[in-house]
Structures are given as C-alpha cells and as structure tokens.
Amino acid sequence: MKENRIRKNAEFRRVYRKGKSFSNRLLVLYVYKNYILKDINRIGISVSKKVGKSVVRSRVKRLIGESYRLNSSNLKKGHDFVIIARTACNGKRYSDIEDSIKNLFNKAGLVIYDEKNIT
C-alpha cells in the first residue's frame, strides 16, 4: 500500500480543488477520478495539529490507514482519495473510524457490492 500513497503537495491540491467531498462527524473524504492510473486507488491522509499532539495524530493516521487497507478491496478502482480527520477523531476506537470510512465510501458510491460484502 505504500506505493499507492499521495505524497506530493500538488497531488493533494488537485484532489482538493477538482475532487468531490463527502463528510460526516469524524472524517472528510475528497475523491478525484484518476484517469492515468485506472487500475489502482491512491490515498492521502491528513490530520491537523488541532486533533492533538503527535502521538494522537499518528494513532489516528494508523487507524484510518488500517481501516482503508482492510476495506480497499471492496472499492471501485482508479480514484485518488484524501481523508481528513476532524477533531472528533481524538480518542475514538478503531470500530468508530471504520464505520465512518465505510459511511463515506457508501455516500460517494464507490463500494462494489456482491454477495460477500453486504454492509
């Protein structure tokens, strides 16, 4: 998954400016269709200093990344995602973050439904 990350500032800006946003209480999701890399999804995670000290921010990033990793096989391919953590993420459990991410991907219409992964 490390090679499927958005790292450059210009890539983040493109997703912010041209992408579509979806939000809930814990997270904000920006989605941009990537016409060059059609067979993979890329993800960028942003957690501001408002969320907490570095230990808290790192934990939130790890929880978001792990939740995405476990659910990425159920998503349509060829998109860039930027997930922004809101201050309400501070102190939340993994299950709360995972439910929030699933909710956002459902709102965006990016979940592939089949018999195995009905949520």
From Swiss-Prot:
Protein's name according to its UniProt entry: Ribonuclease P protein component
Source domain of life: Bacteria
Keyword Heme listed: no
Catalytic activity: Endonucleolytic cleavage of RNA, removing 5'-extranucleotides from tRNA precursor
Assembly notes: Consists of a catalytic RNA component (M1 or rnpB) and a protein subunit.
Family: Belongs to the RnpA family.
Enzyme class: hydrolase
UniProt-listed Enzyme Commission number(s): 3.1.26.5
Source organism (scientific name): Clostridium acetobutylicum (strain ATCC 824 / DSM 792 / JCM 1419 / IAM 19013 / LMG 5710 / NBRC 13948 / NRRL B-527 / VKM B-1787 / 2291 / W)
Keyword match Amino-acid biosynthesis: no
Primary role: RNaseP catalyzes the removal of the 5'-leader sequence from pre-tRNA to produce the mature 5'-terminus. It can also cleave other RNA substrates such as 4.5S RNA. The protein component plays an auxiliary but essential role in vivo by binding to the 5'-leader sequence and broadening the substrate specificity of the ribozyme.
One GO term of the biological process aspect: tRNA 5'-leader removal
Residues spanning the signal sequence: none
GO molecular function, one term: tRNA binding
Keyword annotations of the record: Endonuclease, Hydrolase, Nuclease, RNA-binding, tRNA processing
Transmembrane annotation, as ranges: none
Record PANTHER family: RIBONUCLEASE P PROTEIN COMPONENT
InterPro entries cross-referenced by the UniProt entry: Ribosomal_Su5_D2-typ_SF (IPR020568), Ribsml_uS5_D2-typ_fold_subgr (IPR014721), RNase_P (IPR000100)
Record-level GO cellular component terms: ribonuclease P complex
